[in-house]
Amino acid sequence: MWELVGLLLLILAYFFWVKSKTPGAKLPRSLPSLPLVGSLPFLPRRGHMHVNFFKLQEKYGPIYSLRLGTTTTVIIGHYQLAREVLIKKGKEFSGRPQMVTQSLLSDQGKGVAFADAGSSWHLHRKLVFSTFSLFKDGQKLEKLICQEAKSLCDMMLAHDKESIDLSTPIFMSVTNIICAICFNISYEKNDPKLTAIKTFTEGIVDATGDRNLVDIFPWLTIFPNKGLEVIKGYAKVRNEVLTGIFEKCREKFDSQSISSLTDILIQAKMNSDNNNSCEGRDPDVFSDRHILATVGDIFGAGIETTTTVLKWILAFLVHNPEVKKKIQKEIDQYVGFSRTPTFNDRSHLLMLEATIREVLRIRPVAPMLIPHKANVDSSIGEFTVPKDTHVVVNLWALHHDENEWDQPDQFMPERFLDPTGSHLITPTQSYLPFGAGPRSCIGEALARQELFVFTALLLQRFDLDVSDDKQLPRLEGDPKVVFLIDPFKVKITVRQAWMDAQAEVST
């Protein structure tokens, strides 16, 4: 009896404590919450988290809160509120929560993806952007992308009229692009380095996708945790591989020939070491560990994401062969077979660009953006958001809002075209496939170029159809850190028009 009374008093004390933290403030409506465990007992046990959070909007509205352990998290499910968080008040919400698994992957908050807002994060992010600017000179980036896309096509020629899984070949080609950007290095497709990169990249994505209780209850790290050990293992492999490549790059470094992200970071370190006016700056901002964390983030953000979206594009085209034929008709008409499609062809290959945009809508790279953190006491809409509150934008909710999208669960590339089909449009602001603001995807421009050029080259040269076993790709997906797609095969057939054109050239 007395135990029950004590429990009730504890619960009441907890709720009064929560209310007393922000007296008089208008807070977002909250899920029920209990001491210590927070709202966990009241969250759906089954289904994908992004879908469950979307459904909770029916009861709690487009902004609501919940407690995970002792941490308050605000869920955003409407584009106006999302844009307020990401853009209008981007600096106020540019922080990153320091969770256990993310700290493991970021070497305690280094790099650009999981680092908290601050001068070190801002500087490293700025240097990554300068790397992409470096590759824009003389269309160097597009040449690199075309080279790897052609390499993929050459491999596929050997599998004419076969049904194969393109996951690994696509992964290897995309990885080589990232290796060139980060290290000015490319590998043969059977090189053990590429295999090692594939192992740790896929391993980290898979391991971090599972809900790990230590991110909610950090004190659980005192107990053995199989999930954490798996993440540590893959992070160790990643660090060893990248360190080995980095050391070789440092040996060959030439300040007169800056050609990669690593070169830019090494040069910045040298400049910082020689500059005595950088008072107040973290002395370790360009330590080897900081540099490797940033390079590791580019690998994590630039490989599995693009690879996965390319597979989603192929899957939806197999399901919708009429869309594939429309794209090929555009390619035949405006590009032909005498040259390689380029990113500049977007103004003519409208159905292709619309298809890419629709895939990014219906299966966003990350259904929920990486959590943000309020750096100061702030507000979202009419609601108060105290400092250190975690904020999660549910991109799935934005991209599947029936008030903004007609039949949001249907694959309809034409929604991104005007009624005449002659101009690309953005039908609503409820579309943020790469996020926005200070924490937007740092490789958005690269990803858009890769998706367009790879898909254009593939459809210029091949028909990609349902596999011989007539098993269509599953479209449900597996939402980890990246929205993965289940393995599937496509039947590859070299297009007769392409073969005829090559025969003419050879004669």
From Swiss-Prot:
Biological pathway: Steroid hormone biosynthesis; Steroid biosynthesis; glucocorticoid biosynthesis
Known cofactor(s)? heme
Lineage here is: Eukaryota, Metazoa, Chordata, Craniata, Vertebrata
Which top-level group of life is the source organism from? Eukaryota
Name the family the entry cites. Answer: Belongs to the cytochrome P450 family.
Q: How is the activity of this chain controlled?
A: Regulated predominantly by intracellular cAMP levels. The 17,20-lyase activity is stimulated by cytochrome b5, which acts as an allosteric effector increasing the Vmax of the lyase activity.
Q: What is this protein called?
A: Steroid 17-alpha-hydroxylase/17,20 lyase
Write the record's keywords in alphabetical order, separated by commas: Endoplasmic reticulum, Heme, Iron, Lipid metabolism, Lyase, Membrane, Metal-binding, Microsome, Monooxygenase, Oxidoreductase, Steroidogenesis
Question: Catalytic activity, per the record?
Answer: a C21-steroid + reduced [NADPH--hemoprotein reductase] + O2 = a 17alpha-hydroxy-C21-steroid + oxidized [NADPH--hemoprotein reductase] + H2O + H(+); progesterone + reduced [NADPH--hemoprotein reductase] + O2 = 17alpha-hydroxyprogesterone + oxidized [NADPH--hemoprotein reductase] + H2O + H(+); pregnenolone + reduced [NADPH--hemoprotein reductase] + O2 = 17alpha-hydroxypregnenolone + oxidized [NADPH--hemoprotein reductase] + H2O + H(+); 17alpha-hydroxyprogesterone + reduced [NADPH--hemoprotein reductase] + O2 = androst-4-ene-3,17-dione + acetate + oxidized [NADPH--hemoprotein reductase] + H2O + 2 H(+)
Recorded hits in PROSITE patterns, A to Z, give: CYTOCHROME_P450 (PS00086)
Looking up Pfam families in the UniProt record yields: p450 (PF00067)
Gene from which this protein is expressed: Cyp17a1
Name the principal localization, coarsely classed.
endoplasmic reticulum
From which organism does this entry originate?
Rattus norvegicus (Rat)
PANTHER family the record matches: STEROID 17-ALPHA-HYDROXYLASE/17,20 LYASE (PTHR24289), STEROID 17-ALPHA-HYDROXYLASE_17,20 LYASE (PTHR24289:SF13)
Q: What is its EC number?
A: 1.14.14.19, 1.14.14.32
Question: Broadest EC class?
Answer: oxidoreductase
What does the function comment of this entry state?
A cytochrome P450 monooxygenase involved in corticoid and androgen biosynthesis. Catalyzes 17-alpha hydroxylation of C21 steroids, which is common for both pathways. A second oxidative step, required only for androgen synthesis, involves an acyl-carbon cleavage. The 17-alpha hydroxy intermediates, as part of adrenal glucocorticoids biosynthesis pathway, are precursors of cortisol.
Q: Which GO terms describe its cellular component?
A: axon; cell projection; endoplasmic reticulum; endoplasmic reticulum membrane; neuronal cell body
Q: Name one GO biological process term.
A: hormone biosynthetic process
Provide the residue positions that the database annotates as binding heme: 441
Give the Gene Ontology MF terms in alphabetical order. Answer: heme binding; iron ion binding; lyase activity; steroid 17-alpha-monooxygenase activity
**Entry's localization field:** Endoplasmic reticulum membrane; Microsome membrane
